[in-house]
Amino acid sequence: MANAQQMANAIRALAMDAVQQANSGHPGAPMGMADMAVALWGQHLSHNPVNPHWANRDRFVLSNGHGSMLIYALLHLTGYDLPLQELKNFRQLHSKTAGHPEVGITPGVETTTGPLGQGITNAVGMALAEKLLANEFNRDGHAVVDHHTYAFLGDGCVMEGISHEACALAGAWKLNKLIALYDDNGISIDGQIAPWFVDDVSQRFNAYQWNVIGPIDGHNPDKVAQAIAQAKLETQRPTLIICKTHIGKGSPNRANTAKAHGEPLGADEIALTRAALGWEHGPFEIPAEVYADWDAKAAGSAREAEWSERFAAYQAAHPELAAEFVRRMAGDLPKHFAQVAVDTVVAAHTKQETVASRKASQLALEAFTAALPELLGGSADLTGSNLTNTKSTPNLRFDAQGAVVKTEEGVGGRHINYGVREFGMAAIMNGVALHGGFIPYGGTFLTFSDYSRNAIRMAALMKQRVIHVFTHDSIGLGEDGPTHQSIEHAASLRLIPGLDVWRPADTTETAVAWSVALSNRDKPTALLLSRQNLAYAPKKDLGDISRGAYILSEPKDVGLKKKAQAVIIATGSEVQLALSAQKLLAEKKIAVRVVSMPSTTTFDREDVKYKKLVLPAGLPRIAVEMGVTDGWWKYGCAAVVGIDCYGESAPAGVLFKHFGFTAENVADTVRAALQRKR
């Protein structure tokens, strides 16, 4: 490099200036990792600032996202569309430089990081996606998918349990193109970490079957660059490069202390730091020669142009594969998807099978996985319960050399055994989705969505198409008892902005839920599915199911020639209960409409006219769902048949009676609501 020290100091200066101007932020990590960044971004990272979305770019993840001024400085200096004014607006409303990096806001940011440990886990997902796409699309002489995934991570990331889940899988999957650089500075918010972090990180990652390099001097760019070059030669293992660094490097009084972590250095300390670094330039001033040393636009454009030539040759030799690759990376569904979705829904409606909705999900998946090669499934050690596997998705396996094991038909596996790692699974799926080329889905019990929750939230924040298959959704799972019976989980998931939640009642609603989830380019989806069998609910019109709620049965459908006096709203397994209660009430000449509401989150986005059509004003509304009642009062319910306590261990049928989920109790609740109205 022309002047590696000045290049690193430019990062340090921008970091401390931006944090000082914002009066908020984390200067220490960017100052400590600046030399590591010079080595990676200056000598190894293959990227194009002119086109941040180049398909074959290396992916870079700043897992310790609080050090966001590192990546903002790098993006600005290397030539991305991130003007200096944006750095001056660090942490300000509507700027491109949020407190933590956000994908879709800042060009060049690959994932939203901040919750520690999830960035390295996203990176595992990205590296997995690269490996699987290379296996699927590369041909002899045509390596169109051939890039690395790099991650910077700190002490907090390796403390978080999710890093164990993800990095163990990375070793098992032999993700040799994943290279992580560990900013080992020994400091966290509470101070020196030695009293509470005694892991031998090197031995830990060796146990994960990683290639471990170091510890090395993280402030020697040449040493770091050499380590990266060595890591790129690895053919079977991911690599961890342990870089010993000093947080707040250059600050005479704050370096190596927690005071460098999460607050401005202060004007006096910044002046002292400038002097110590020999940085004679004012706030936000970068010399032209330093900009020139960092500028990656020409080199990046040349790399992409060279790849484009290779891709053109690939297109000529394999036109169908090339077209499929372009479609997949664009996130477009195939043209025949709409017809497959219609056929799948109609088939379910025609067969009218009585099956658990988890089985209904598998039936829908059989059609969708056959039609969509981008579907990449999995389960957290519950495949036989979640039913996430299909004939088109054999289990993913790797041979001793790290190659994807292919079936007799010559295809690689598309169903991942994540092991008992719900949080890791969820964040890996986020990384797969962020990389592009796949639509990931994964299964576990609904109760264990709590393990995954923050990664689900991150998927919603990042607007990623990730599908969660949550089975055993209620007390209907029976004898396993309250530890496994979901009570608050449906309501809790519905509270996450940007997450679509579906709790379908039968095979048709489940097929619709899957088709909507697959069509949602900018939303994750949670499917809440039953363990127990559910009878088919007869329907006349299928068109309104996708709107989240629809009129399932009117009084005339049970022999009454009068208008509805009340509305029963039900979801999932309770829809049959509502229909049974409707019949009981009809025997007493009480007319009731039954509304199936498989997705409250979808229905809530509908226009007022449709909402009033489904839930007319003036009629008492009674909601029925085996879970907490809080979320139902927003619909103006007169009563809710729900569960505001934990479950019990007993057969499902016994529990239904114990908690009042009988047709008789629902009918009595409706009668009581009508009596109160009088």
Question: Which ranges hold each PLM region?
Answer:
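Conserved acidic/glycine
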Residues: 1-33, 152-153, 157, 161, ...
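Thiamine diphosphate
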Residues: 1-149, 297-528, 533-535, 613, ...
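Short glycine-rich or small-residue beta-strand-to-loop segments that form or flank ligand, phosphate
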Residues: 60-62, 110-112, 150-154, 213-214, ...
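Glycine-rich anion-binding loop/nest that anchors nucleotide
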Residues: 154, 444-445, 570, 596
